[in-house]
């Protein structure tokens, strides 16, 4: 309790000093690379990053240890190449994003308390009843619920709440939970991109690139861009339509990628399930559920009062521990994924060390240089495409939180130097950072949290298994976002709202067509979302290939 309480007040002080913005560490070390060794430091940083990924992909060591080794190697390299004295432990800890760590710790404590009430088992039975036992219908329900919750909470919190439910549900239905969990976390990143509070990169962008924040920039040229800053409502209006366009293609990709595991019907006796998996502690559920509801309401009010979400989560955890069972806290704390928290700490130290070594800044410089090489007429579309895809690929392989923190000042300076409109570039960065997080297991915080909880339950998610599903979904959704940005901000620059309406109508029309096509084949509306359209396309491509090869042989 003391640890959590002191942590809460520490986060309060840090958050208030930073103006309540969340999602990034405001302390920045003054580190300068020795003259003449900049290129060498850059190369060493890149090699360290590749080595860490090699360890994670091949699973030579556990990913937490891989991140710790990478962070240690990066700090040693930074000590060697920097002009300053060796980094102290205090200096190294400033590289850790304590806002993220605090949010995760507080939410894990609350989820641990809730799990003892039996509410997750009850929710699993209710989801089964709604699906009628059809596995694909259940998958669609879980994905859509995840996307909506992620938009209005945040994707990390959503996955902390839904992962135990999904695992319990899979056990009840004798399913392997990993495909369900991967599908959910992919949609948590997609849904979280729709609002300012849904994904950590959006929180950072909304805080740093608001009109008020830009107007306080000491550089007059940058402060002049304040009118182009973005607000909470702007995220919904500008990001929302593209995210809606990604829903059906995303579901079709999930259906195709897991067509064998997420199909069929599981028949269970509902009465027996309700008897076996009922609420075990109604009083505890009322207390902890009420506290969680207040925490969620406080999350909603974050854009208004600017109270750090880490503070809200930590205080909620302390209050819930005190209110439910103040004499027994060991059991709830067993549910805290300490290895996940250590993984994040190592990853933040690694990536911020690479930033000081110049690797991430070099990426930003190359992006700006590439955009500046285009003609004036082509500069805006080129900037949108390059920022979007570089952000997506980089966020897949470098956690999107430190990447976004690095790119925010790069984007602001680039728009001022090249006289580009700021808003389209902001949305390109947000789409790329959020959707790119689906690319790999460590691309987004929600991915890592889900993998940690799944491993604790006995279902480890490998890097390669996640990559096989996540990377294709990332490519498809990023492509959709690119088309949306080009049509709305380049082709339809004079009337962007009209183009948003047209794209939404086309999306609705395609959805109706998909429903009618599926229902004419005897499918339910939800089953229609997973109609085998992709299978038909692939089969047609194979037939075309065979035809061509047959002609050549003749």
Region spans (language model):
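Juxtamembrane and boundary regions of transmembrane helices in multi-pass small-molecule transporters
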Residues: 2-26, 175-178, 182, 193-197, ...
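Interfacial loop-to-helix junctions that mark the boundaries of transmembrane helices
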Residues: 32-41, 60, 64, 87-100, ...
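Transmembrane alpha-helix interface/packing and boundary motifs in multi-pass membrane proteins
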Residues: 54-61, 112, 145-154, 185-197, ...
